[in-house]
């Protein structure tokens, strides 16, 4: 997928004027790219548009104009773009009870190690590869970045909406498997095609 450059970024003052229209577009896009795996885990599959939105929001919130700092943000988010034959997602552990955040998060220690989150298509599975640095022995982050590298035959299954495709998480006492809607699979296929341009 083509990297986001400084020329793609709207200065935050101008972005403020366009923000509502931009947000409506991204909210609609994210609805097709977001899936809940049970009551706690959500995956949002990222692409150039979703990441550009996050960059714009960060620059706006922090009032960043310095070209060096803008480039720093671009570097962080460009690293999350899917590469060739790859899907990239943000995994969120969503805990709404503020008093139990640490206790509940601790139950997910180790989620980012081993074969815990998978896309399953026609009997084949591809496990998510988590970005490092989001947990250590005593603490786990609520936000993770995950990459999936589906095989060519899995990609063909994504395109055939008569064949089932699921996403599964299996960690400790948390077991969920959810069917992926056709709209999400269409987004995946676009990402996999776009990734070839990276």
Task: Locate each region found by the language model.
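Long, contiguous binding/interaction regions
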Residues: 1-88, 95-198
